[in-house]
Amino acid sequence: MLFKAIRIIITICSLVNTSCLLASDEKLSQTDNAVDLLNLSLEELLNITVTIASRTEQPVSSAPSSVTIYVRQDIQNMGFDNLEDLLNFVPGVYSNRDDVRGQRTIVRGHLTGDCSNGILVLLNGARGNNARCGGASEHLSYLKLTDVERVEVIRGPGSAMYGSNAMIGVINIITRKTGNEVKLSVGSIGYKEAGFKLTKSFGDMDASIFANYSEDKGDDYEPFYNYFGEFISTKDPRKAVDITGYFNISALTLNTTFIHRKNAEYISSAGGFGDLNDNVHGENKRFSFDLNYTMDVSESLDVDLYLNSHFYENVWSSIIIPSGLASQIIWTNGAERDSLGGNTVEGKELQLGIIGAWKLSDNHTLSFGSNYRKEKIDRNSFHGNYDNALLFSSNGAVHNPLPEGQDNIGFFGGVFGIPFTPNEIYLIDATSRHTYGGYIQSELELSNSISLTTGLRYDDYGDTGSNLSFRGSVVYIPQDGTTIKGMFGQAYRAPSIKEFYGEQAATGAIGNPNLAAETVDTVEFSVSQIFGATQVSLTWFNNNFEDGIQIVQIDDVVPGTDTFQPRNVGKLKTSGWEAEIYYQLSENFTTKVGISYFDKTDEVGAADTIAFWAFNYHTERWNFNLNGYYRGNVLAQKSDADTILNDTTINSYAHWNAKIRYQITDKIEIYGVAENLFDEEYRNYTIISDLPEGVPMRDRIIKIGTNWKF
């Protein structure tokens, strides 16, 4: 499959190259003066600045980390709808669809844990991960890129700057601060989207608001067998609301964000259930405000004070036991009704901090920062369609379902071998966590061609212990167009509240108060070289993980039920190569290709070969983009001596997309997008153990739309 994809790429390059030689030299109008990485010269590309690597602005070529950047114009040209789409075009990284609630990110051959908690996600520099599961994908699923100015990605450790969860990656999403625009779009599977951006200035004050709504009716999927042997059909309708606000006066900046997602039906992680009646769904809401005050203390010292806070609510519902079996083992009256279950999680976070940069001399900068963070989740109760009033009146003897459409809050036993109790059995009790941290970093230019960065961060989690993270890098630029980097970084992930304090045995899982943080030591070497109109980058990495947290089966806590608990399971090593080629054939045509090969990966669930490609051609008013990615074979389930006779492998596939944009005037644009251009049917790996064949992906989707600037 990979060689077939490469042959297609070569053929397209040949065809497009011929047409480019005859094409006009005129450029697509850039009415908003946005940077377009796919159309920059190689020299301009090297001078693009980033802030994610050191929290100070610096050219990407000299950043002390492996960094990938996508800016607004690239996002528009390539047709990325959400963050998960974009991550498939970052070297060493790809995104897998997991269940109804969203996707999971795999970085450098390593799965990133529950709700991708091995990656730190920042929104305008503010922490986006939540305390319950430790990651961001639970409440930032399918994060829209409509109002995003740029996305910066660290491929590798970032804990020496950012603390916990920045273990194998950091993503910073920066929203737009200016623009006046209306967007409308429609498409197949009932897709609809409408949004606007409005910016106003009042003397020294600048303010903007963005609002966007999108929905679709979902794709229809072929029936499949779930854990209980049922042959079922499903869909995957989605709804999304995004609202962002920006306010700036002098040195004070406020960013606000509201995100609402409802992803329904599809497949549940509890038994691999599909559904067509909204019994399976995930609904997430998140509101955040981030306040920042910048002080120019002196010509050599800049300090930022910040206050970040976010509130979130996650609602999840699933079929627990299908009706046929529930009538026998759950319902006292033998009702032919599904046993439903779920929960609602509410939480909040407050963070106060200071970051600064002190220019000691022309060639030496000292960066520093400290922060306090309080994370809190409310009591996490079980929701189900059990008649609790009848359960209480019968002292636990009768367990019948409620009428259709009704549910109760609270679990009191009486089923699954768990004795009835008048006291509610919580999934997680109300819990709070306090964290203190601080870092210091030195950036020293030893000469015109060599720079040295060293940094150290200390974090103290009141419940799970403390951690010290070190980083060091040397960047050598012997001549224009050549960059050599050597990097070492330590990173960690503190156990989440869910892992540490635990869900009760009623759910088949319990927490582990003895968990230690999982850690990683990473070594990287990279070389970037310009050859005429071509830039080639090659990166080698080696990750040594310690105390990795995994879910393991333990002795029965409740007789007759399987019980699972997170444990520190020891060591793991991943290593591999990332290659990226950027080729500028002419002023109008550019290509970008990335191939990553991992010689050591997680044993199950990670592809050893991935690739991506993007071809962009533009004239004065037209822009054509063809892009795609390749995923190698994935071992989804290993054989054992008892029940699994053979390994299960998910086959490789190539996924293609296309987008055409036409600038009618400087203010009005129309476009068309095709996702999964060749309408291929394929599956990707999921952690749902009951579905070793993987979960299905969407068929071809066509969208058309317009952007109107005013």
Regions found by a protein language model. Give the residues of each.
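Face-selective signature of the C-terminal outer-membrane beta-barrel domain
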Residues: 246-262, 283-466, 477, 537-538, ...
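Short acidic/polar hinge/loop motifs at secondary-structure boundaries
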Residues: 127-155
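Gram-negative outer-membrane beta-barrel transporters
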Residues: 445-452, 540-544, 561-639, 673, ...
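Extracytoplasmic beta-strand/coil segments of soluble accessory domains associated
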Residues: 51-52, 56-67, 84, 88-127
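Periplasmic-side early beta-strands and strand-to-turn transitions of outer-membrane beta-barrels
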Residues: 160, 172, 179-180, 185, ...
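N-terminal periplasmic accessory domains that precede
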Residues: 83-86, 103-108, 119-124, 138-141, ...
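Conserved C-terminal beta-signal and adjacent last beta-strands/turns
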Residues: 199-201, 241-243, 248, 282, ...
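Outer-membrane beta-barrel signature, preferentially recognizing the C-terminal barrel domain
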Residues: 275-296, 427-433, 477, 483, ...
